[in-house]
């Protein structure tokens, strides 16, 4: 064996890898989002590294916002588990999220709303 160091410890400590998500202080996977952005662009174009970090930060913020509002909706109904109904109430209750998310949520039900003209005044009686 001429000069090989295979299988021998050279004495240097191997540096632990730090993910781009932890560098950016995010929970969402920056590397995976970067890979998906590269694969989805036309003719596998170039995507900057900061684009993936920015996209991951946006997705994480929106997810946290929706989950917080849905958690509040489930807490108001005295339930411990978030259901699609709670997501629907949270998204449709917030004006900005409602404008952003136009999708139909399966199992979300309908938003309770009674038109003002259908509500009678307190002093009025129905005549038959």
From Swiss-Prot:
Keywords, sorted A to Z: Acetylation, Chromosome, Developmental protein, DNA-binding, Isopeptide bond, Nucleosome core, Nucleus, Ubl conjugation
PTM field: Monoubiquitination of Lys-122 gives a specific tag for epigenetic transcriptional repression.
N6-acetyllysine PTM positions: 5, 8, 12
Expression sites (tissue/organ): Ubiquitously expressed.
GO molecular function annotation: DNA binding; protein heterodimerization activity; structural constituent of chromatin
Residue numbers of N6-lactoyllysine PTMs: 12, 14, 116
GO cellular component, one term: nucleosome
Gene3D superfamilies: Histone, subunit A (1.10.20.10)
Compartments where found: Nucleus; Chromosome
Cross-linked residues, Glycyl lysine isopeptide (Lys-Gly) (interchain with G-Cter in ubiquitin): 122
Compositionally biased tracts (Basic and acidic residues): 1-12
Chief location bin: nucleus
Role noted for this protein: Variant histone H2A which replaces conventional H2A in a subset of nucleosomes. Nucleosomes wrap and compact DNA into chromatin, limiting DNA accessibility to the cellular machineries which require DNA as a template. Histones thereby play a central role in transcription regulation, DNA repair, DNA replication and chromosomal stability. DNA accessibility is regulated via a complex set of post-translational modifications of histones, also called histone code, and nucleosome remodeling. May be required at gastrulation for correct mesoderm formation.
PANTHER family, sorted: HISTONE H2A (PTHR23430)
Quaternary structure annotation from Swiss-Prot or TrEMBL: The nucleosome is a histone octamer containing two molecules each of H2A, H2B, H3 and H4 assembled in one H3-H4 heterotetramer and two H2A-H2B heterodimers. The octamer wraps approximately 147 bp of DNA. H2A or its variant H2A.Zl forms a heterodimer with H2B.
Family: Belongs to the histone H2A family.
Name under which the protein is recorded: Histone H2A.Z-like
Species annotation: Xenopus laevis (African clawed frog)
């Amino acid at each position: 064996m001429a000069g090989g160091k295979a299988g021998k410890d050279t004495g240097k400590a191997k540096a632990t890898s730090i993910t781009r998500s932890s560098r950016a202080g995010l929970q969402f996977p920056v590397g995976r989002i970067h890979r998906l952005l590269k694969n989805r662009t036309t003719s596998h174009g170039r995507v900057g590294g900061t684009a993936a970090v920015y996209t991951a930060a946006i997705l994480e913020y929106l997810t946290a916002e929706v989950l917080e509002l849905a958690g509040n909706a489930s807490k108001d109904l005295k339930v411990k588990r978030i259901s699609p109904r709670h997501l629907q109430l949270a998204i449709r209750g917030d004006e900005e999220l409602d404008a952003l998310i136009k999708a139909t949520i399966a199992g979300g039900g309908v938003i309770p709303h009674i038109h003002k003209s259908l509500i009678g005044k307190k002093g009025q009686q129905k005549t038959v």
